[in-house]
Amino acid sequence: MFTRVVEMTSKSGKAQDLANTINEKAVPILRKQRGFVDEIVLVSSGDPRVLALSFWDNKGDADEYQREQYQKIHDIVRHLLETEPEIRTFDVHTSTAHKVTGKQAA
């Protein structure tokens, strides 16, 4: 399993709006992507940061999404962002909620 972590800084007072927009407009697009497993959105209670963690069957599926659909989602949320998102990627080592290929879930 593979994950993309997209760290965003919302405009002042817009973190909840950003999270809601991701849920209402981005998640339906994600659900249609090959290999998409789950999306978790975290909203900071102390600052305007929002993290969007998307889980994928494998890196190839996540890369395909990045090439073919990410810009569309970025355009949907752009008006709520203070800065450009920072994207990091990771192999999932352990999960208690997802089956992780090649590793045993805790």
Which functions belong to the PLM regions below?
Residues 12-14, 60, 93:
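Residues that cap or initiate secondary-structure elements
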Residues 23, 70, 102-106:
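Short intrinsically disordered coil segments
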Residues 7-12, 54-57:
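Short beta-strand-to-loop capping motifs
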Residues 24-25, 29-37, 55-89:
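An amphipathic, aromatic/His-enriched active-site/gating alpha helix that lines ligand/cofactor pockets
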Residues 9-22:
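Short, surface-exposed ligand-recognition loops at beta-strand->loop->(often short) alpha-helix junctions
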Residues 2, 9, 40-48, 75-106:
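Glycine-rich beta-strand-turn "strand-cap" elements at beta-sheet edges
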